Design a protein with these regions (language model features):
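Dinucleotide-binding Rossmann-like beta1-alpha1 core, especially the glycine-rich loop
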Residues: 47-139
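Active-site substrate-recognition segment that forms the wall
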Residues: 16-20, 24, 33-34, 42, ...
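Helical element adjacent to the flavin cofactor pocket in flavoenzyme catalytic cores
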Residues: 155-204, 209, 213
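Helix-loop-beta segment of a Rossmann-like dinucleotide-binding subdomain
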Residues: 92-110, 121, 134-179, 288-292, ...
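C-terminal catalytic lobe of FAD-dependent flavoproteins
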Residues: 316-418
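N-terminal Rossmann-like FAD-binding beta1-loop-alpha1 element of flavoenzymes
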Residues: 3-30
Length: 477
């Protein structure tokens, strides 16, 4: 059988695109292992983060503001999307597990990162006339941090909820099949290209599936499936794995869960410390973010220790008697310039929908509609994502002049969250040394193109990252 569309991947984006296409009475086969080992979606806290995700860096460029607009549109789509999934799947279990989001500004971070990002969140809420209220952090129920890192300010965003990512993926599977789609529980080896046209995929088993068009939404693994078109892949921002750890814990009997998301602003290259109630006494704790040379399948002891320490310190000192149910590992897809890869990619009939970093699950309803419209010739009137076409030179977030400084600040923020204790006169020495090292690295990569701060920091460690960046930059020089 030849399908209208093959969608490669089993995360929230792939599942949503496949479901949307099937619901339009098109023949669709979604290909990807449904155990979703190490997928970002499965390990996600699944916050409907929009304003809570804002950083000063996001607002520093028009491309960053476009990502914010994607988040805002997506947030408005979720109630109807959740109802559609319930209707199609027949699964009426409540998808949302948290009501609203508390953003806390505590003393575990540093002024140049935490305070600046907290102010950016509040300023943008005001600019968008979005609902929120300032609250006394002492009045946030459930929150019982160590006094040394207690929050000094807090705000509540009433319409930024969170959902159960595991249940979402189950509903997407069931909804696809109910709408007539085919679910192939096997991973893809490569996309098949013939005479400059995508014609299908080859599975790891050797089986071949054919389609008029192929959408690759396989997260951090997406570009690995295009190895037979190296001249095209070389012009696409390479995707790096943002390895992250999250933990599910079971609270002791009689102990209540928070009713909202509780989170800090984004800091130290990560998405901020956060907890999300999952119901039935289960609490989600997240999340770390370490750029790795390749996707990881197991959590490091150091990252588990760090996350648990932060949760005990900054959220609830009584968490020590909770049971650990699961240590989850996910790999976020992080493009070389930090911006999504959405659109046809140099081969007729071949589309990419990945590179969304930590926003993919939240943006999945929007991306499903956007990609389905584009694939079927329907004009997208809500938003234009042409600038995120995968075949592109690097997009600019932070200016090159401040990149080394921003990288140093994020690295120092990591130290503060570890509760380091160093002599004050060491700070200027560390600052000067790291700034010089990072600036030298930036200059050595390319005279014009500059990676975002997290890639500056981790490519300084890994030669393989530097090689991939240089190869991509050379393609556009």
């Amino acid at each position: 059988m030849k399908y209208d569309f093959i969608v490669v991947g089993s995360g929230a984006i792939a599942g949503s695109i496949a479901y949307e296409l099937a619901s339009r009475n098109l023949s669709v086969c979604r290909v990807g292992s449904t155990d979703r080992t190490n997928a970002a979606s499965k390990a996600a806290g699944a916050m409907n983060g929009c304003f809570g995700e804002i950083t000063s860096g996001l607002l520093a460029s028009e491309h960053g503001k476009l990502k914010l607009n994607m988040d805002c549109i997506s947030k408005a789509l979720w109630p109807a999307w959740a109802q559609r999934l319930a209707d199609s799947s027949g699964d009426t279990r409540a998808l949302f597990t948290a009501k609203g989001t508390h953003v806390i500004l505590n003393t575990a971070g540093m002024e140049e990162i935490d305070s600046v990002n907290y102010d950016a969140i509040e300023q943008t809420l005001n600019e968008y006339a979005a609902p929120y209220e300032t609250v006394d952090p002492r009045e946030i129920e459930w929150l019982k941090p160590n006094d040394l890192v207690r929050p000094l300010r807090a705000l509540y965003i009433p319409d930024e909820h969170a959902l159960d990512s595991h249940l979402l993926l189950e509903k997407l599977d069931a909804a696809l099949v109910a709408e007539g789609g085919v679910l192939k529980d096997e991973n893809v080896k490569s996309v098949l290209i013939e005479d400059g046209l995508a014609i299908g995929v080859e599975l790891l088993s050797g089986e071949r599936l054919m389609a008029d068009k192929v959408v690759v939404a396989a997260g951090a693994h997406s570009l690995d499936l295009l190895s037979n078109i190296p001249s095209v892949v070389r012009q696409i921002p390479p995707i790096f794995a943002g390895y992250g750890v999250s933990i599910l814990v079971k609270m002791p009997k009689g102990r209540e869960l928070p009713t909202s998301v509780i989170r800090t602003p984004n800091r130290a290259f990560a998405c901020g410390l956060h907890c999300v109630p999952r119901g039935d006494g289960v609490l989600y704790l997240g999340a770390t973010n370490i750029l790795a040379e390749k996707p990881r399948s197991q959590a490091l002891i150091s990252d588990v220790q760090f996350l648990l320490g932060c949760a005990l310190d900054q959220l609830d000192i009584n968490l020590h008697d909770a049971d650990i149910l699961s240590i989850q590992v996910g790999n976020r897809p992080i493009p070389a310039d930090g911006f999504p890869l959405i659109g046809e990619c140099g081969v007729n009939g071949l589309w990419l929908a990945t590179g969304t970093y930590r926003d993919g699950l939240h943006q999945s309803p929007l991306l499903a509609d956007y990609v389905a419209n584009a694939l079927t010739g329907i004009e997208n009137t809500q938003i234009n994502l042409d600038s995120f076409n995968p075949v592109r030179p690097p997009l600019v977030g932070f200016s090159r002049e401040v990149m080394a400084k921003e990288t140093v600040q994020q690295m120092l923020a990591t130290g503060y969250e570890y509760r380091w204790d160093i002599k004050p006169y060491w700070l200027p020495l560390l600052n000067e040394g790291m700034t010089r090292n990072y600036q030298d690295l930036i200059e050595s990569l390319h005279p014009q193109f500059t990676p975002p701060p997290e890639l500056v920091a981790f490519s300084y460690i890994y030669e393989s990252m530097r090689e991939r960046l240089r190869s991509y930059y050379e393609a556009w020089s």
